[in-house]
Amino acid sequence: MPAYNPSARFDKAPFHSSLFQYCVIPKRLGVSGRRQVRNHMSIDNYVIGDQVELHEATSSKVKKVSSNHRTRFTQGVTMRILITGGTGFVGFQLIKLLSSHELLVLTRDLTKAAQRFAHIPSQNLQLLSPLDELSDFNGIDAIINLRPDNRLPINAEEKPKAGIARSRLDITEQLVEKIRASAHPPAVFLSGSAWFLCDQQAACL
């Protein structure tokens, strides 16, 4: 596989937009019948991989984007990608999909991560804990942030909404600080989240 050339990558990038967000729903992820939970990633830049359904979300409609562009900018190149929360439900599937690239995976539990990713060649995987092991993000092509605390309470009193929001903001702020400290920052930053639908929405949010 040829080396990745960042200077040639974004000349005609198909998905860049400051006005829209994109919902990326891995085909293999379903909906829980009991809790009616659907996972998604909100993306405001680019999308990696060919096993996704890509939709452009607007206020009035959802329009499917042509699948011809899904992997146009990653075909035939090796990228260096930082992924946070790689041992989670979405992250684990994503890492399997991107295993041919050079992956840096930020995880809370190095032992658990090493076991889950034993099938990935060691030269393609570097496990990190904590993020401070990296002083900056020079040489990293993309960041995929999947690390927010998704262990939601049974009811809002057990963990206030502000705490849930903070769990999603802290890691993002740390990543942004290191991006700013980089002379050659990553060209792509993706940040994931999830929505929850149930009969008593107040208890889920």
UniProtKB/Swiss-Prot annotation:
Gene3D superfamilies: NAD(P)-binding Rossmann-like Domain. Coiled coil: none annotated. Pfam families: Epimerase (PF01370). Belongs to the NAD(P)-dependent epimerase/dehydratase family. This is Protein Rcp.
